[in-house]
């Protein structure tokens, strides 16, 4: 969708050429006296447009309005969550008219957060997946809304927020695209090709490692998962450099299982098709880099994506097999369907070479997290309170929320093995937590967080499809880090290398 930002009052929005005009109406009084504002005020007074966010009133050919159809949408207090509810309801209603051009205007003042929420919600409500669909007789099968003009009281005041939101939407839609693709349209090789395309963006570089390079690195755990598939594995390394070279990067690690049968520990047939979504962690990393390449914030970011299929041919790993990870730790594979942690652990070890300021892994990791949190919030695991607060704040800002879960050491008891350094599963109880405890073993001493997006990465049923989460959360976190100056931190090792020796300090003091 093509977005445009303009300074528009309600009266000026009424004069804009469009197929549908959407007016976002907050609970504050309307003071304008133009015909449409007066009509809105009358509708509110009569109770036809309640203040509750998401309530709608549709009008046909109101006086002095160019658009033939007008949708009034309540946004309540005007906060991001309320704006999102109102915009999604309004855009869904507008789609019934088959419009190509829509004008959407705030009736009252709107800040940057409200504008960002409106852009994200409009894109979300109008998104249509088309890659594997045939075109209709008129040559169209995608979203009907091609152009949306967003009207605000002062476009200059919210321009930066609008630009960031538009870039974030591009990242979310890239994540949706690759999440929605079936396994034969999204192999590790094809995913790596998509990453290489991102390498053409400003300040973004991409490197792709294959089976030989992965074996040479000693990534025995990752390679073991991949060995049951005819599709070769790929290890994707993305780098965005918006800060100085000595700035410690944030490393994002995305699980890239492009299809998960469960391996020898075979999944049930029902809903196995949804295991194409098991690479949504990887898709979120690609989507985040898509946004970074457009926004170009002053921060350094590394993206790591271990990608393979989890299949079950004669070469596949078996329950009871012991594999050696890149860290040197051995792992007893008690369940081959707990493969995500087996590929992530090697990527976490690889992340250490970047001397990161923080590492965040993103994975559709456990059904237990779905049971705990449903599809509303992603699970957040970290022992670092500052990182937890920053990620939770980013989730609230972007309406891509997460919820922190515990990491008590007692949860790791079930991971003990008689035959290896650690087992890859620990029983049913607290499954999301024990999976996070497994990953924590490989995070070393750097600041680390794990986002379990098994409940939030896609929807099932009639609305089946990728959500693009948590691209919004990740971009919001990185942007706030860049703005706050936290991104300027130099890694401790690099700082130590820069520190002059005692002899040099003594010589200077004698001068």
Curated annotation (Swiss-Prot):
One of its GO terms (biological process) is proteolysis. It is found in: Cytoplasm. The gene is pepA. Gene3D superfamilies: Leucine Aminopeptidase, subunit E, domain 1, Zn peptidases. It catalyses: Release of an N-terminal amino acid, Xaa-|-Yaa-, in which Xaa is preferably Leu, but may be other amino acids including Pro although not Arg or Lys, and Yaa may be Pro. Amino acid amides and methyl esters are also readily hydrolyzed, but rates on arylamides are exceedingly low; Release of an N-terminal amino acid, preferentially leucine, but not glutamic or aspartic acids. Residues 485-511 are annotated as: Disordered. Keywords: Aminopeptidase, Cytoplasm, Hydrolase, Manganese, Metal-binding, Protease. One of its GO terms (cellular component) is cytoplasm. SUPFAM superfamilies: Macro domain-like, Zn-dependent exopeptidases. The lineage of its organism: Bacteria, Pseudomonadati, Pseudomonadota, Betaproteobacteria, Burkholderiales. Presumably involved in the processing and regular turnover of intracellular proteins. Catalyzes the removal of unsubstituted N-terminal amino acids from various peptides. It comes from Variovorax paradoxus (strain S110). This is Probable cytosol aminopeptidase. Belongs to the peptidase M17 family. Its cofactor is Mn(2+). One of its GO terms (molecular function) is manganese ion binding.
């Amino acid at each position: 969708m093509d977005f445009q930002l303009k300074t528009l009052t309600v009266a000026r929005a009424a004069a804009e050429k469009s197929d549908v005009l959407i007016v976002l109406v907050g609970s504050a009084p309307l003071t304008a006296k133009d015909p449409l504002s007066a009509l809105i005020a009358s509708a509110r007074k009569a109770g036809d447009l309640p203040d509750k966010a998401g309530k709608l009133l549709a009008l046909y050919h109101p006086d002095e309005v160019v658009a033939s159809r007008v949708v009034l949408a309540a946004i309540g207090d005007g906060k991001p969550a309320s704006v999102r509810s109102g915009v999604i309801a309004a855009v869904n209603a507008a789609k019934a008219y088959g419009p190509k051009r829509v004008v959407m205007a705030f009736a009252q003042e709107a800040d940057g957060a409200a504008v960002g929420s409106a852009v994200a919600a409009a894109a979300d409500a109008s998104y249509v997946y088309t890659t594997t669909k045939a075109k209709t007789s008129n040559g169209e099968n995608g979203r009907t809304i091609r152009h949306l003009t967003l009207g605000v009281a002062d476009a200059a005041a919210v321009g930066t927020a609008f630009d960031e939101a538009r870039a974030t939407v591009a990242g979310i839609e890239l994540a949706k695209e690759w999440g929605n693709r079936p396994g034969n349209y999204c192999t590790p090789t094809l995913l790596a090709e998509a990453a290489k395309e991102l390498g053409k963006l400003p300040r973004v570089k991409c490197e792709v490692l294959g089976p030989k390079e992965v074996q040479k690195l000693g990534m025995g755990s990752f390679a073991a998962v991949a060995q049951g598939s005819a599709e070769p594995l790929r290890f994707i390394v993305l780098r965005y450099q918006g800060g100085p070279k000595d700035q410690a990067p944030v490393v994002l690690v995305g699980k890239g299982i492009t299809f998960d049968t469960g391996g020898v520990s075979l999944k049930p047939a029902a809903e196995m098709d949804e295991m194409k979504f098991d690479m949504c962690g990887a898709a979120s990393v690609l989507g985040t880099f898509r946004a970074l390449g457009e926004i170009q914030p002053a921060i350094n970011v590394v993206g790591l994506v271990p990608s393979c299929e989890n299949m079950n041919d004669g070469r596949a790993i078996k329950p009871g097999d012991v594999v050696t990870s890149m860290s040197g730790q051995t792992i007893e594979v008690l369940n081959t369907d707990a493969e995500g942690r087996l590929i992530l652990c090697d990527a976490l070890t690889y992340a250490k070479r970047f001397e990161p300021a923080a590492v965040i892994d993103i994975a559709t990791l456990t059904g237990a997290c779905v049971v705990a949190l449903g599809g509303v919030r992603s699970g957040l695991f970290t022992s670092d309170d500052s990182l937890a607060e920053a990620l939770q704040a980013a989730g609230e800002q972007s309406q891509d929320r997460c919820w922190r879960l515990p990491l008590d050491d007692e949860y790791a008891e079930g991971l003990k093995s008689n035959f290896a350094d650690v087992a890859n599963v620990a029983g049913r109880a607290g499954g999301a937590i024990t999976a996070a405890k497994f990953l924590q073993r490989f995070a070393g001493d750097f600041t680390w967080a794990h986002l379990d997006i098994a409940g939030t990465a896609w929807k099932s049923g009639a609305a089946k499809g990728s959500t693009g989460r948590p691209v919004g959360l990740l971009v919001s976190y990185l942007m706030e880090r860049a703005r706050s100056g936290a991104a300027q931190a130099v890694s401790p090792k690099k700082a130590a290398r820069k520190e002059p020796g005692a002899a040099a300090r003594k010589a200077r003091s004698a001068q």
